[in-house]
């Protein structure tokens, strides 16, 4: 049975993925496509609704992204957001101009609650504005259904044609009733049924993979991260022992993480698959000896991983399919819009060029990260793995500033384990987007037990974020930071100082290297 589809047409807005996530939270399937998607392509997709995103341009500017006017004649409900609202007005005969007063931040908007878009919404509601242009005059067929003191057309509708537009951003959390507005659009206006459920997705994908693979052999590079783990379990459910997972332990994992991965996926684990663990720690340390530049470290770790994986793949022999944990943000960012679960060979991550196989299987390519976690829970994967903290591909190699050595790896592993343990003990682990300890390349003088020390400084990092594109430093309780600091300097040999990084992103990145 074909599911309902809402298309998000991307005009360059920073929140395009967030819009799609919010729609999916309403249990409606949603895809993001570029603004130059043709009307014929849209017809073939047969969407129940279309959402135009925001964007940084002015609709009257040269080379600004526009859309075909024919899209408004398809009879499909359309919801324009910010730039998308201005675009709708501009193409249909309204007037868009530079606003006398720009609006940015939380703004009280008066709305007409008789509109289907604002059913169940307060007549005066807090919304997030971010615009320098505005709709000075709505198109003739449109009715104004929202305004602020300086924005006469904060929302408008043409109910007969199911066209709706708002100047604010209903998708961001600062718009207090934004989720309700999006729900009204997909249900009250588009007539969606809410058929996007994770249990049905998992069942359908397992059956698709089973039919495709048949008796073929499948190979998966298992990192122990959320994406590759969920992909591996899903494939295991579909084809069992036809799947071989290769886990390369490069010695740059968090404390005990390699053993935890083997405990879950290895011979004594709960999954029906073949598991190979390659202990390549010394090999990676040798390659990284004397290397301090971050990008060079990344490159060495990536290339060596491919070499190790290639060697193991050759031992297995020819495989029919290679599994990759590609998720939907990767698809959007690569400009690929098609939604097939299994597709032909293309190079993602370097591995396909070095392994002999027929096709790639990407079972998670329709899912956002939060949906991957939901799929993991649906598959019965332990919560400690499903909600594992994000971890970079190069591992601790980029959480050790400067040269990587076995001694430094142990220091940062021990410090990070203490930090994660105390965050969990305080019950705030689910409130923080990402948190970890890093080893600086700085040594400082200290005093411990009446003895002078000259040891390393550990930097603690914790951020809150909804999308990892921007982030703010987490306001951790001093009591927690104090306990973490005391434990690290007392329990981790080679450390006499602990610092907390208060920098946001931007200007800093979340990782140190």
Curated annotation (Swiss-Prot):
Active site: 82 (nucleophile), 169, 171
Domain of life of the native organism: Bacteria
Sequence ranges assigned to domain GMPS ATP-PPase in this UniProt record: 196-388
Cellular component terms per the entry's GO annotation: cytosol
Keyword annotations of the record: ATP-binding, Glutamine amidotransferase, GMP biosynthesis, Ligase, Nucleotide-binding, Purine biosynthesis
Enzyme Commission designation: 6.3.5.2
Swiss-Prot/TrEMBL catalytic activity: XMP + L-glutamine + ATP + H2O = GMP + L-glutamate + AMP + diphosphate + 2 H(+)
Positions with a binding annotation for ATP: 223-229
PROSITE patterns: GATASE_TYPE_1, GMPS_ATP_PPASE
Residue span(s) of domain Glutamine amidotransferase type-1: 5-195
CDD domains the record matches: GATase1_GMP_Synthase (cd01742), GMP_synthase_C (cd01997)
Matching HAMAP family: GMP_synthase (MF_00344)
Protein name: GMP synthase [glutamine-hydrolyzing]
Gene name of the encoded protein: guaA
